[in-house]
Design a protein with these regions (language model features):
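Short glycine/serine-rich loop segments
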Residues: 1-92
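Acyltransferase
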Residues: 127-150, 173-179, 203-224
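Short helix-loop capping/hinge segments that flank enzyme active sites or metal/cofactor-binding pockets
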Residues: 110-114, 164-218, 234, 239
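Short connector loops at secondary-structure junctions
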Residues: 145-161, 192-193
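A short helix-breaking turn/cap at a secondary-structure junction
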Residues: 54-135, 153-156
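Short, high-confidence coil segments that cap the C-terminus of an alpha-helix
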Residues: 32, 224-225
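Glycine/threonine-rich flexible loop motifs
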Residues: 125-126, 237-244
Length: 245
């Protein structure tokens, strides 16, 4: 990083995650009532989780990306980081120019949630897993029905990210990257450059497969109100160690 790395509000020796780290820190430290971030692979959700905030990753295409610096345009989204669900609902309405959802009489009674069994649970650390299970128990006590389901399409889609994310990101930024590669953090540079190795045929095939998986995933989950997953499998890393590793 070229400037200071934002820290987590209740532990100043660990990082706030990215890429919306400054957005999360500004709300967590009381500098702003809400913030807006971009999320392609977790950049709103994880900083929000690590700072005890609500982060909303909106559906791709729901909010205009005009004026947003792109990473992977077909996956990029914009969403708010707030202190409460109510604030997130108000921010979403403002972003899309709609009427806010009325949460006055909102209830979890009878709502159906699915926990998607994927490899996300294989390597999760104890503390995030305990927090996730505690949240699930709370939902059940409030009347929600929570079921574990196997959705292989989710895991299969994740495997495509190395092809689609890397090729889109490198295709967008290759001229700037190769003009001054030393300006980019080495590990991030390697991730971007991996997109140069993806053939056009593999890129198209990955998109066709993702479209198929999306349809199958929708069919598996359409009967549920939401799918529940941990926001992050790990706790925030130490800022010094992160810069050295």
């Amino acid at each position: 990083p070229c400037t200071a790395t934002p820290r987590v509000v209740d532990d100043l020796i660990v990082v706030s995650c990215g890429s919306s780290s400054g957005a999360a820190a500004s709300v967590a430290f009381g500098l702003a009532p809400l913030a807006i971030g971009s999320d392609t692979g977790g950049s709103v959700r994880i900083p929000a989780a690590w700072n005890d905030l609500v982060g909303l990753k909106t559906t791709s295409g729901r909010i205009s990306l005009q004026g947003v610096l792109p990473l992977c345009a077909r996956f990029d989204t914009v969403g708010p980081l707030c202190r409460s669900v109510e604030d997130a609902a108000l921010a979403l309405a403002a972003l899309e120019g709609s009427k806010p959802v009325d949460l006055t009489n909102a209830t979890l009674e009878g709502r159906r949630f699915a926990i998607c069994d994927t490899s996300a649970f294989d390597d999760i650390r104890e503390a995030p897993l305990v927090a996730f299970n505690t949240a699930v128990d709370r939902l059940r006590r409030m009347g929600a029905v929570v079921e574990r389901v196997k959705i292989p399409e989710a895991q299969a889609a994740l495997a495509l990210s190395g092809v689609l994310f890397a090729s889109e990101a490198y295709g967008t930024w290759k001229d700037q990257i190769e003009a001054n590669p030393d300006a980019m953090f080495s590990e991030i540079l390697l991730r971007f450059r991996s997109g140069a190795q993806v053939s056009a045929a593999d890129y198209v095939a990955a998109w066709l497969e993702l479209d198929r998986l999306r349809e199958a995933y929708y069919a598996e989950t359409v009967s549920y109100d939401a799918v529940l997953m941990p926001s992050s499998p790990i706790l925030p890393p130490n800022v010094v160690r992160l810069g050295q590793d």
